[in-house]
């Protein structure tokens, strides 16, 4: 079985046949599964630059301004402690309102944010949390 086949099997075990289930019901099923399975707290970081960062990371934004803004805004380069996950949270830092919210605390200064769970990954690639978050992110971005 390939890595992708194994991932598809894990996802199907959580949501069932997602073609027969509404997107919201699948998100609920993932929330229930992750609530029971994630080992919190755990260290996480961004999968890729957060929405607000694109202007600075791949656009014409000033590096000096980017560093200034990073002091008060979450960055994909930061390491956070994922302390909880929640449903129906809307945060300016989340790219998709349908996403589950990860309540995170930045390790460098203790600032707390809500980030989209599909936008973060566990730092420890060998942990069960890495696989759980990756499975959710893959399902979410492919089905939203």
Model segments located where?
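Basic/aromatic-rich interaction segments and small domains that mediate binding to polyanionic partners
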Residues: 1-47, 62-135, 143
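Short, catalytically relevant binding-site loops at active-site mouths
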Residues: 49-52
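Short, polar loop/linker segments at the starts of domains and inter-domain junctions
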Residues: 54-64
